[in-house]
């Protein structure tokens, strides 16, 4: 799936990926997709919870070694 915005949070640790993801989502229009990459061990669960709390949809989660990439659709 194509993303409308890409956010690279590799090398950043909690809570920085959450703050940056929240700001990036706020910049999107409803229906647009954000691609977030991170290597913080807590990032996958933290970003899933953030999306759920804000009412957005996690479309896909991809793991490659220590890095996780999530596609989040803004509602």
Question: Where do the protein language model's features map onto the residues?
Answer:
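Short amphipathic
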Residues: 3-10, 35
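A short acidic, often aromatic-flanked loop/helix-cap motif at beta-alpha or helix-coil junctions
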Residues: 14, 67
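Core SAM-dependent methyltransferase catalytic element
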Residues: 69-75
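Amphipathic, hydrophobic secondary-structure cores in small proteins
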Residues: 15-59
């Amino acid at each position: 799936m194509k993303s409308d915005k890409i956010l690279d949070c590799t090398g950043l640790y909690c809570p920085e990926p959450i703050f940056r993801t929240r700001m990036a989502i706020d910049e999107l229009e409803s229906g647009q997709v954000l691609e977030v990459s991170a290597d913080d061990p807590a990032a996958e669960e933290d970003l899933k919870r953030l999306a759920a709390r804000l009412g957005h949809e996690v479309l896909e989660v991809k793991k490659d070694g220590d890095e996780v990439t999530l596609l989040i659709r803004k509602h």
